Design a protein with these regions (language model features):
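Alpha-helical, heptad-rich or low-complexity scaffold/stalk segments
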Residues: 29-32, 38-51, 55
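Short coil/linker segments at helix-helix boundaries
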Residues: 48-168, 172, 176, 181-189, ...
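Acidic, serine/threonine- and glycine-rich low-complexity intrinsically disordered segments
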Residues: 179-247
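Bacterial Sec-dependent N-terminal signal peptides
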Residues: 1-19
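Residue signature of alpha-solenoid helical repeat architecture, marking inter-repeat boundaries
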Residues: 36, 41-43, 141, 145-149, ...
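Structural recognition of alpha-solenoid helical scaffolds
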Residues: 18, 22, 150-157, 193, ...
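Short N-terminal segments immediately surrounding and downstream of signal-peptide cleavage
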Residues: 13-31
Length: 247
């Protein structure tokens, strides 16, 4: 087992009050009679909300050593033994996230986010990007940069949620990752994300019964059909297998 080195505890490096103040300032700016008419104000709001979404898991990734985790995120509030996908794991518990580590190597296996700085951060960022582009298409390059960063983070979170067994939430995360890339023309939508969302929603539907199952299967079907209408097809054709199960 890897050696645990836990010096005097310090909090996860997320300054919640500071981040909330940034969001409040961005909200106030777009509500201002003059500043709200500027696309740049909406770009800034999109950036603030995207950054707040990303921050709690910004330094995480599978295979990162515990020592690097502690250096970048801080020391955990505590640690305990658990399991990850049925295998032994050591959990480093932080304010915003529980990080699962391989006991043999000390490498990150996965994580589960427990808190968000604010609700609907990614969705608000996407809405703000769309508003900014509507007001001034010349802001496209700035918007595209935010959209790509946010989409990558959402897809990574989708993987993390799926690894923890949160299938429906993972599906939504992949769908939002796809939507982030549809705001401006220069970001090419990743239909793999849409396929992942449909696949996960179909898997989730199979665990339900009655009207809930019907609604979830219908949602999966819609996602698959949207992907197919764009000309998308996964490498081995599994999209048709999952689509069949939606009927």
């Amino acid at each position: 087992m890897f050696a645990l080195a836990l010096p005097a505890a310090n909090a996860q490096k997320v300054a919640t009050a500071k981040e909330l103040a940034k969001l409040e300032k961005a909200d106030a700016t777009v509500l201002d009679a003059k500043k709200g008419l500027k696309a740049s104000s909406w770009v800034a709001r999109a950036n603030a909300y995207a950054n707040a979404y990303i921050l709690p898991t910004k330094e995480l990734g599978q295979g990162i050593p515990a020592q690097v985790l502690q250096m970048n995120v801080g020391n955990p509030e505590g640690s305990y033994e658990s399991t990850f996908q049925g295998m032994p794991s050591i959990v480093f518990s932080y304010e915003y996230v529980d990080v699962y580590l391989d006991p043999a190597t000390g490498f990150i296996q996965g994580w589960e986010q427990k808190l968000a700085i604010k609700e609907n951060l990614a969705e608000t960022a996407i809405e703000s990007m769309a508003k900014a582009y509507e007001m001034d298409p010349k802001q496209e390059s700035k918007i595209a940069s935010i959209a790509l960063t946010l989409s990558n983070a959402l897809a990574q979170q989708g993987d993390a949620l799926n690894n923890m067994g949160h299938t429906a939430e993972a599906a939504q995360s992949f769908l939002t990752a796809f939507q982030a890339l549809t705001v401006v023309p220069s970001t090419t939508p990743n239909f793999d994300y849409l396929y992942n969302a449909g696949m996960l929603m179909t898997m989730y539907a199979s665990t339900l019964q009655g009207d809930e199952a019907v609604a979830a299967f219908n949602a999966g079907e819609q996602l698959f059909n949207t992907a197919l209408a764009s000309g998308y097809e996964d490498a081995v054709g599994n999209i048709y297998y999952f689509l069949f199960h939606c009927y």
